[in-house]
Amino acid sequence: MITQDKEFMSAAINYAREAALRGDVPVGAVIVQKGSGTECGTDRIISAGGNRKSSDPTAHAEMNAIREACRVLDRWNLSDCELYVTLEPCPMCAGAIVQARMRRVVYGCADPRAGAAGTLYNILNDSRLNHRCVITSGVLAEESKALLINFFRERRDKKITCTYHTGTNGSTMTM
């Protein structure tokens, strides 16, 4: 595993932690522009994002990072950029990655329910589409997976009580 991949994935994991603190699913992403740093030939993070799905079902970490990268660069074509994301992209995000012409996607843990970078679908390398990406999987996978497991475990462990009015006599039932 390339040291730089770990460095950029660590940054994505930090955005995933921020998402969890907001109550969103802990997925984080960063977009790195290749060869754009202050030193000749170095790479730099140009955008980042975490899930913000509480009011927008399309506000996945990848979508937020892509939107921000396009705004920062003032263009839609991100062919000189790489995406680092803690969870394998879903079909929607994979479609956006293809449309943005990103050259490479690096993800942490696989998504057996909606993974579109090879686990369930392989949209990023579908020969019927106009663009394909290099995919690197498993970078800091255990850390990424642990964030998700702990987040959903905490949600399940919180006891939710609901009070139902069961009749006209004012009786209630709490579950």
Predicted regions span which residues?
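Short loop/turn microsegments at loop-to-beta-strand junctions
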Residues: 4, 26-27
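A short, polar/charged loop-to-alpha-helix boundary motif
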Residues: 53-64
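Helix-adjacent hinge/juxtasegments
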Residues: 63-100
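Short beta->alpha transition motifs characteristic of CBS
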Residues: 44-53
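Small-residue (primarily alanine) positions within well-ordered alpha-helices
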Residues: 12, 16-19, 29, 47, ...
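Zinc-dependent deaminase
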Residues: 1-19, 39-41, 89-175
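Short beta-strand scaffold segments in enzyme catalytic cores
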Residues: 27-39
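Residues that line or immediately flank small-molecule/substrate-binding pockets and catalytic motifs
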Residues: 33-34, 85, 109
